[in-house]
């Protein structure tokens, strides 16, 4: 059963008129409210420059407030919206903040709040993070009570800009008060990694170079950058999802056992393993950019008028990693991510070494697949006797498909889970400053090389293909053994994202 906490919390969403707020932040707050994890006494204030009324904002977000199955619950939606108001004001001058201060203080006085609990959510472009944080600190910070600030990615563009950003933020808010959101850390299967790895003797025992042949973290999206090309052109797939989301996944997958679930113990281990990553070898990558689909119905990346006509922006990358520690030394690790591919999925593939020959001549490797999305699942491809008289092997699976096993469970959306953590002050699933520093140190030399004058030309791959040419060979070179065509059959069709 849901627990209630802190009454009369004030949540202010900066950038409330924007896309992220509408699609993620408000729906997440609604989800928490619907499930009983947001106290009905909470006051939610949207703040942005656009001149909107309370009703305008409510109407804007209303279509996105749904139950997990997509159904509407008008009564709950209306209750929730009655907690929401809007205030228009600038980001870079005091006037709007002073008005906001008055609104918040009036609410807290009326409710007789001694120790304010204020959460500020910055759903804003990074160019104004610092302005807003400075104004917040000046005008809305109280010495007593709790103030927390959630900031959205990107946290910098490279090591230097991330360091500068951090140097400006640090004097304003302490690490305890800052919550750098990486929404992948709020996904159910990502949160499951620690428990699965360290809560199962058999997995824990096999999680090392003696047993594991290769590791892959895979991100595929079936759509391109349509409409976001201008933004994406200076970002590319490596900054967009690899340096942050996928590296977080890889870190949780490869770190040592923390002493407890305590946030700092977990984050200490993450930083430690990141420091053991070898520098990325510029020759150990495969990069691509999507062209038109084979039938010509889908545009190429360069067809987007908002991108440079000779852009070398990378929309697909496969990167080989090495971790120089006792557990992982010599195990090839591949992170691959691409837009405009044949399907949408995010998964982890751990392929185990072959069993000794002799008894067997040609028996497939075990493979553990953790599907983060869509349709969360964990399956272990293993070998078993085909039922019947013959003594033949068949590759089958130990299967945990969440929609089957956990039919009646509410699986929170990433933002629901993370906003709740921030309200409770739990930093476990947020990015710490030193983590950010090490991750940028790892990726910046590669980005400088790719974006520098001698940077290679990405291979063009057709929109909608499974992977760019060369990926099969790249994976094979990194220890991945492909199953023989037709040797493994899954009886159920996996829903497409
Ligand atoms: P697949 O056979 O789809 O893929 C295995 C791996 O080989 C993937 O990494 C895939 O890459 C790669 N690969 C294969 N052929 C190529 C190629 N031509 N080019 C590039 N890469 C290639 O997955 P599984 O064997 O794990 O499972 C088979 C099917 O069964 C899947 O649809 C899976 O979802 C389903 N299944 C579902 C379960 C569940 O829902 N609980 C349980 C077990 C199986 P890429 O990913 O890029 O295609
Ligand atoms: C965002 C990226 O951070 O993550 C997007 O900017 C990407 O380009 C998205 O599509 C993927 O998130 P999810 O939760 O849809 O897998």
UniProtKB/Swiss-Prot annotation:
Sites where the protein binds NADP(+) 2: 336, 345, 349, 371, 379-381, 399-401, 466
Residues that, per the record, bind D-glucose 6-phosphate: 153, 183-187, 221, 240, 339, 373
Positions of the catalytic residues: 245
Pathway: Carbohydrate degradation; pentose phosphate pathway; D-ribulose 5-phosphate from D-glucose 6-phosphate (oxidative stage): step 1/3
Gene3D superfamilies given in the database record: Dihydrodipicolinate Reductase, domain 2, NAD(P)-binding Rossmann-like Domain
Sorted UniProt keywords: Carbohydrate metabolism, Glucose metabolism, NADP, Oxidoreductase
Record InterPro entries: G6P_DH (IPR001282), G6P_DH_AS (IPR019796), G6P_DH_C (IPR022675), G6P_DH_NAD-bd (IPR022674), NAD(P)-bd_dom_sf (IPR036291)
Cellular component terms per the entry's GO annotation: cytosol
Highest taxon in the source lineage: Eukaryota
Role noted for this protein: Catalyzes the rate-limiting step of the oxidative pentose-phosphate pathway, which represents a route for the dissimilation of carbohydrates besides glycolysis. The main function of this enzyme is to provide reducing power (NADPH) and pentose phosphates for fatty acid and nucleic acid synthesis.
Family named by the database record: Belongs to the glucose-6-phosphate dehydrogenase family.
Record protein name field: Glucose-6-phosphate 1-dehydrogenase
Organism: Kluyveromyces lactis (strain ATCC 8585 / CBS 2359 / DSM 70799 / NBRC 1267 / NRRL Y-1140 / WM37) (Yeast)
Gene: ZWF
